[in-house]
Regions:
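Non-catalytic C-terminal accessory region of glycerolipid acyltransferases
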Residues: 1-112
C-alpha cells in the first residue's frame, strides 16, 4: 500500500496530488530490485454485490538510484489509478500530515 503514511523517519516528502505528502519508500525500494516487475493491483468493487474485478497495471516510468525520484514515480502511478477508479479509493487517515519523528515539510511548495 504505497499511499500509506509511514512512521517518522521511514519516508520522504514527495508529490502526491500536487501536495507534499510524507510517503513510504518501501515500494520504491522493492521496485529497485533487479529483474523484478513492479505491478499495481486494483480491486474494483462491482455494483449490486456482484463481487470484484481485479485490474493489474505495470509501473509507468523508470526506477533509478534517486530515492525521491523513485517515490514520486510510485506516487504518480498511484495517482493515475485513483483517477481511473475514483469511487473505489477511500482512506480514513490524514494523508498529508506530518508524522511524529518525521522531518518537517519542506518550506518550498511542490505545486505543479
Amino acid at each position: 500500500l504505497p499511499d500509506q503514511v509511514p512512521t517518522g523517519g521511514d519516508g520522504v516528502w514527495a508529490h502526491f496530488f500536487g501536495q507534499e505528502a510524507y510517503s513510504m519508500t518501501l515500494a520504491a525500494r522493492l521496485a529497485q530490485m533487479n529483474g523484478v516487475a513492479t505491478l499495481f493491483f486494483v480491486g474494483e468493487r462491482l455494483p449490486h454485490g456482484r463481487g470484484f474485478a481485479l485490474h493489474v497495471y505495470p509501473l509507468e516510468g523508470e526506477i533509478g538510484r534517486d530515492k525521491l525520484a523513485n517515490v514520486e514515480t510510485i506516487n504518480r502511478n498511484v495517482e493515475k489509478l485513483i483517477r481511473l477508479f475514483p469511487s473505489q479509493y477511500l482512506f480514513s487517515y490524514n494523508r498529508f500530515k506530518t508524522p511524529a519523528g518525521a522531518e518537517p515539510k519542506p518550506s518550498s511548495g511542490l505545486k505543479d
